[in-house]
């Protein structure tokens, strides 16, 4: 960098350090607009005072609705705000006072520059006391500033300050007005410190000049108030960028021994017109007004106001605007932009095919929240919408995790994912075929003993099982020798079927072998199991476990839907001829559910209804032996996959058939 450039840089910094403080301290351009009260929005910043007059005036302050309906307030065609008094009604001096309006700002404001542009103020009328002023919430400790005030035939504005204690002002400050009282504190009475402006700054002379502007600059050191006639308004004000340094000599420069920052706190602004009262009534006889009772000037004022309504037609305010300016702020008041964030969670349950899990129906439980259950099984999952009114959950305090499938078990074919319609009800219907068989001998199964339950039904009591019966009045459900997975499209002990899109032409793959893992399930309230006893005769458990028709309603119009088939194989060779099957026609149960389905590894469903139909054309056939040595069953016309159907042909059933054939051969 050259030496000349360095000199210029240092010089610029030095010059800016000298100029910047001067601008910041003395230039009115530091004021920026924060609020503008005008036109239709003028009353948005005010509330109406309708209480009794604190100055004991002969006045009735109207609320907003009455003021609007009676024409006391309105927005003019030019956009100015009109606020007048009743000038039509003759009153009784002993009755309520004349209708008028008093409005107060909704908020309190701090130090700044406040400008009011008046087209008209209440004229020089006997008995009137108009004022535009500010006051703190705790008078007199928070101070009062009377910006515009006059009484009776006033033609010169009077500016007054009120403070607590003692606050003396200097009369040596440069101002165009005349200080008539220098003590602002209440200690010297309620007069306050007063500066009287020149004639023509108030009342009728002010209005004859088409009004003008009053500006108040309030700081922690002083209060200055300027008056500008319409033709003398500074250009910086009309341009919206007021510069108080160019305003010239103020009407009042109020500054003295007291700390203004302590004596004047946050202020609200008030605009009103009252009649008579302590000041206007007290000096009524000294203002050249007609006195009806020389001994009582206040009563003379009341008599005049009550009996001469037309005299107050000019006692109105017409305001073009009130603007608030403060330092260091922008045109708009500061606001915090809040950004609302919303997160939408799509609840769904994901269920994987788990071959070694047995599901148990629970009559009525509730689910605290949807859950996702996934086991290490090579099967695809399908999303199920969350139920609108969840009524299912895993019973008990603990849930047994689903073990991994055994090596001999192959996964069921992949089920297509359901069409998740975000809240649409899932409708699933399943047809279950019931086949009744009869054996002529009792036999012990590999893991349990067939025992009589009652009503011609039997139950297998497992020798070792982790499943506990639910304490419900539902019909007993035979326990499957091989736990079966809860797949989409299945019903569990009469529960709500899981919807599926698998076509009947795509049956599930066969399950080869047995899993040596224990059968986990949802823990249920304990119920004693019947003692295991051997029987000589009995019936094979029904092929399907379904709800009792007497306990559950039967929906009408139910129809079967596509589902996958369940086939259980046995290591025992299939007989060449089957035992007699006492089934004139298979029983078809159509289970319909229109509620949303909730699924988990330990499936528990709400109560579903079943509709029973009978078909004489669909007959169950005996299982036949395959090349692999496993027995298979002939599929019904509409194959289904249910927990009950998985128990229709098991080791216990085949054992009974073999025993029957053996006894027939011995005979």
From Swiss-Prot:
Query: Which residues are propeptide?
Result: 644-667
Q: Where is the lipid attached (GPI-anchor amidated alanine)?
A: 643
Q: Which residues are glycosylated?
A: 63
Q: Where do the segments described as Disordered lie?
A: 361-424, 448-647
* Residues of the GH16 domain: 25-288
This protein's source sits in the domain of life called Eukaryota
Question: Listed GO molecular functions?
Answer: endo-1,3(4)-beta-glucanase activity
Respond yes or no to whether keyword Cell cycle is given for this record.
no
Among the GO biological process terms of this entry, one is: cellulose catabolic process
Where does the record say this protein resides? Cell membrane
Major subcellular location class: membrane
- Output compositional bias ranges, type Polar residues: 379-394, 623-637
Output the InterPro entries linked to this UniProt entry. ConA-like_dom_sf (IPR013320), GH16 (IPR000757), Glycosyl_Hydrlase_16 (IPR050546)
Q: Which Gene3D superfamilies match?
A: 2.60.120.200
Query: Low complexity bias: where?
Result: 397-417, 448-480, 488-502, 517-534, 573-622
Which residues constitute the catalytic centre?
A: 144 (nucleophile), 149 (proton donor)
Per the UniProt entry, the signal peptide is 1-24
Q: Look at the named UniProt entry and state the broad enzyme category this protein falls under.
A: hydrolase
One cellular-component annotation, GO: side of membrane
Q: What are the protein's UniProt keywords? A: Carbohydrate metabolism, Cell membrane, Cellulose degradation, Glycoprotein, Glycosidase, GPI-anchor, Hydrolase, Lipoprotein, Membrane, Polysaccharide degradation, Signal
> Recorded E.C. number(s)?
3.2.1.6
Q: How does it sit in the membrane?
A: Lipid-anchor; GPI-anchor
Give the protein's function: Mixed-linked glucanase involved in the degradation of complex natural cellulosic substrates.
UniProt lists the family membership as follows:
Belongs to the glycosyl hydrolase 16 family.
Q: What is this protein called?
A: Probable endo-1,3(4)-beta-glucanase AO090023000083
Query: What is the protein's species of origin?
Result: Aspergillus oryzae (strain ATCC 42149 / RIB 40) (Yellow koji mold)
